[in-house]
Amino acid sequence: MKEIHKQPPTIAIVAGEVSGDILGAGLIRSLKVQYPHARFIGIAGPRMLAEGAETLVDMEELSVMGLAEVVKHLPRLLKIRRQLIHTMLQEKPDIFIGIDAPDFNIDVELKLKENGIKTIHYVSPSVWAWRQNRIHKIAKATHLVLAFLPFEKAFYDRFEVPCRFIGHTMADAIALKPNRQEACEYLNLDASQRYVAILVGSRGSEVTFLAEPFLQAAKLLKQQYPDIQFLVPLINAKRREQFEQIKAQVAPELELILLDGKARQAMIAAEATLLASGTAALEAMLCKSPMVVGYRMKATTYFLAKRLVKTEYVSLPNLLANEMLVPELIQEQCTAENLAEKLALYLSQEESALQQRHTLIQRFTDLHKLIQCDADKQAAQAVIALLEQEDK
């Protein structure tokens, strides 16, 4: 077999936030098995740097959230992108991998592909859900998309855009049968007690819209099940302060166990979870925690979203199952009464409710197996295959 890479390859990877840094580090580790002397360049966070990557700028420079933030930092982001493209065209890496951050990375990939550099986009944007026309630009910009979820690959296949389903790294990190006793010990909780986890979201806007209905639902649930205790993991000090201010107004008397992070352990310890939509819903599914998904947003945002979003479901467990596996209470349906009513079904000790719970957890386990594929290794294999492929 002809060896394409006599020299160790130069592999460019750009991560724009913490989740991308984690994926990048896992990918580098897996690639080093095949290419122990490869050079890794691009934009890296601390985990990728620890694996030996070189970075053009601090990854934090790219980590901006929300439209207002992006607009404010746009000149700087555009400057970094120009600088990155210039450096890549000088360095001529053997392959460029943009991890997530599609609004930043896809334009870079397009420019590099036009200049003969192989490109991969790692983590599919939600083109299957909204702004579906983006798929044509992705097709122009990339040689391959790496997708976490099987329905994403099915969408790309419809448009004949090269895509490989690699499974989800989170499914690799969480045991098929999570250990509740261990989670309780980690959180210093009494495992004989009953808990419900409440995740109000990681963004300020989510806490603003969801803290009140979630807290009111907890109050109603406490009346029905006085023995239930509530675990509230908060992503950072800023969100914790924001949540505590709302709680002081809405439910000052309600006892809660506030946690700094540790959402995964909280969901494993809990009998049920109340959460905002997003990756947290997938994590709850992998933790085998029966959940209720609640979401509210600005009326104008919701008006637009209803017209733009093309999927029947909003939460990843339901999208994966292609059925309403867990309740989704969105906008005007996201009331304390509705949330509490759906959560109460998971807490009932009646035989029929316990059987439904068992069936749901079995479905969660089947879906977990579906996306547990050793994603780091699968991603590395896809990169290697493209690297070793001779130019046509």
UniProtKB/Swiss-Prot annotation:
List its EC numbers: 2.4.1.182
The UniProt entry's GO biological process terms, in alphabetical order, are: lipid A biosynthetic process
Q: In which pathway does it act?
A: Bacterial outer membrane biogenesis; LPS lipid A biosynthesis
The answer to whether UniProt assigns keyword Glycosyltransferase to this entry is yes
Q: Where is the signal peptide?
A: none
Q: Which InterPro entries match?
A: Glyco_trans_19 (IPR003835)
The entry lists its GO molecular-function terms as: lipid-A-disaccharide synthase activity; phospholipid binding
- UniProt entry keywords in alphabetical sequence: Glycosyltransferase, Lipid A biosynthesis, Lipid biosynthesis, Lipid metabolism, Transferase
Could you tell me which PANTHER family the record lists for this protein? LIPID-A-DISACCHARIDE SYNTHASE, LIPID-A-DISACCHARIDE SYNTHASE, MITOCHONDRIAL-RELATED
Write out the similarity annotation. Answer: Belongs to the LpxB family.
- Alphabetical list of NCBIfam families matching this protein: lpxB
Protein name as annotated: Lipid-A-disaccharide synthase
Organism of origin is: Pasteurella multocida (strain Pm70)
